[in-house]
Amino acid sequence: MINGLIGKKIGMTQLFDSKGDVRPVTVLQAGPCVITQRKTANKDGYDAAQVGLVEFVKETRLTKAQLGHLGKNDLPPVRTLHEFAIVADGPSEAESNGEVKVGDKVLVDLFEGSKFVDVTGVSKGRGFAGVVKRHKFAGGARSHGSMFQISGSIGSSAFPSRVFKGMRMAGHMGQDQVTVRNLRILGIDKDENLLVVEGAVPGPKDATVFITMSKKPPRERRGFAGSSTVDPLKASKRAVAKKK
């Protein structure tokens, strides 16, 4: 099976866990998607599947190359395409790769059994921003005649007589590809293809996001929602009692 799919960011809300704590969550429209192309190691050098997000798109909005690519297998017009890796879920890798076929639908039930996902999107654009807003500089003095928002010195004129690469300066802020890792899955709605994850996701509402299974899922932490808490005082007393 493939390790992810394409979705849309619906918006944010909040939920209460079993302990009564508020959890900020993001609702994602995960799919429905369709497999538009199958990449193989023999032909393409690697195993992957090209996936398209099924949504209402006029054929006039697509190029002839896109229409020809989709028309080979009588697929619906899709505008957003993305490649996802194929992970083995069968007794052998060959059998698992053979299960992925062009035209198959990919729905939100792909993430059943998974606890965490990685979400990739494009962050909101903030335009041209100064160093205080862009890099969280403290700024200068707020007294009369001073310039609070100015960045200050960016290099000496004597030596090195240049500006070092990577110098934090004013410039375009946002509109960057951002990946948020290990977002906990709090709910799945199969009927509406909705995925509820804990935390924030880059991008505005209705932004296109790529949802994949977590590459490095974290271990359960003490006191985390859904895990049992341990009283350190009682635990130390039990340890002393065992030694006696």
From Swiss-Prot:
Write the record's keywords in alphabetical order, separated by commas: Ribonucleoprotein, Ribosomal protein, RNA-binding, rRNA-binding
Q: Which residues fall in a coiled-coil region?
A: none
Domain of life per record: Bacteria
One example of the protein's molecular function in GO is: structural constituent of ribosome
Which GO biological process categories is it annotated with?
A: translation
Q: Where is the composition biased (Basic residues)?
A: 235-244
InterPro entries (alphabetical)? Ribosomal_uL3, Ribosomal_uL3_bac/org-type, Ribosomal_uL3_CS, Transl_B-barrel_sf
Task: Show the segment(s) annotated as Disordered.
Answer: 215-244
Task: Say yes or no: keyword Ribonucleoprotein present.
Answer: yes
Q: Name one GO cellular component term.
A: cytosolic large ribosomal subunit
Ribonucleoprotein recorded as keyword:
yes
The function of this protein is: One of the primary rRNA binding proteins, it binds directly near the 3'-end of the 23S rRNA, where it nucleates assembly of the 50S subunit.
The family assignment reads: Belongs to the universal ribosomal protein uL3 family.
Oligomeric form and interacting partners: Part of the 50S ribosomal subunit. Forms a cluster with proteins L14 and L19.
How is this protein named in the record?
A: Large ribosomal subunit protein uL3
Q: Which organism is it from?
A: Koribacter versatilis (strain Ellin345)
* Organismal lineage: Bacteria, Pseudomonadati, Acidobacteriota, Terriglobia, Terriglobales
